[in-house]
């Protein structure tokens, strides 16, 4: 189960045009987004380490998103 709250994903699905959203669908979307975010975060951490920094900066996230 995802660590992120499910309610925001229900709102995202409704904003995308869904009239009704099952809890399972919102949970699945939350899990998928969490997996993708974790991969981006891992890449950003590696970029920060490569730059000899302990702090992940917005540039690291932007570069990680491009990969």
UniProtKB/Swiss-Prot annotation:
A Pfam short name: CBFD_NFYB_HMF
InterPro entries for the chain: Archaeal_histone_HMF, CBFA_NFYB_domain, Histone-fold, HmfB-like, TAF_TATA-bd_Histone-like_dom
Residues carrying the site annotation Interaction with DNA: 14
Keywords from the UniProt entry: Chromosome, Cytoplasm, DNA-binding
Region ranges (Interaction with DNA): 20-22, 54-57
GO molecular function list: DNA binding; protein heterodimerization activity
SMART domains: TAF
Gene Ontology cellular-component terms listed: chromosome; cytoplasm
Subcellular locations according to the entry: Cytoplasm; Chromosome
PANTHER family the record matches: ARCHAEAL HISTONE A (PTHR47828:SF1)
Assembly and interaction partners: Homodimer or heterodimer with another histone. Dimers then assemble into higher oligomers, with the DNA wrapped around the protein core.
Family in the record: Belongs to the archaeal histone HMF family.
The protein's role, per its UniProt record: Binds and compact DNA (95 to 150 base pairs) to form nucleosome-like structures that contain positive DNA supercoils. Increases the resistance of DNA to thermal denaturation (in vitro).
Name this polypeptide is given: Probable archaeal histone 1
Organism: Methanocaldococcus jannaschii (strain ATCC 43067 / DSM 2661 / JAL-1 / JCM 10045 / NBRC 100440) (Methanococcus jannaschii)
């Amino acid at each position: 189960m995802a660590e992120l709250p499910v309610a925001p994903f229900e709102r995202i699905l409704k904003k995308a045009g869904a009239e009704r959203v099952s809890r399972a669908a919102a949970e699945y979307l939350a899990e998928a987004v969490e997996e993708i975010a974790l991969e981006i975060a891992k890449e950003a951490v590696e970029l920060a380490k490569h730059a000899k920094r302990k702090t992940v900066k917005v540039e690291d996230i932007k570069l990680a998103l491009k990969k």
